[in-house]
Amino acid sequence: CMLYAQDKNTSSFLFDDFQEAVVYFKNGSQFREKMNYNILANKFYFVDRVDNKVKALSNPQDIQVIKFSNRVFYTEGNNGIEILPTNPVLYVQYKGNMRKEASKGAFGQPTETTSVKTYGGTYAGRGERYDFDPEKLILGSRYNIYWIEQKGKKKPFKNFNQFLKL
């Protein structure tokens, strides 16, 4: 059971540990569990109270919003996107590049010089599909994608200079 993200620098989870959250479904029902968001898998995970195992939240299309204390997320496809309480409304998608766990080198010691590939999401640079085992891949780097809502439309930006041009 992975209740806590291991190392802040390499953890693929948004939060340091699983947080109390409420999932509000489009049909009006609610679901309360300890949850976290995996920025590499682009999925919300929860700790099942019955067997204490970490499981992926299914049917994201049926979810209205997910609230972690005062933070609000919605799902777009499998992606979790945070709605920031600003005027105008800002949206943030938390992302990460993954890299394969270091290979074993001489004397069984891990080494990153033997053969390391870096992946952005679950596709390699040439579009080849890479089905990853979460235990074998670690977070390479984190980055965010931002949108601002203007005149009913979401406009993307990646940095402050792009924001100023909107």
Predicted regions and their residues:
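N-terminal secretory signal peptides
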Residues: N9-K53
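Aromatic-patch recognition
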Residues: K34-N161
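Bacterial Sec-dependent N-terminal signal peptides
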Residues: C1-T10
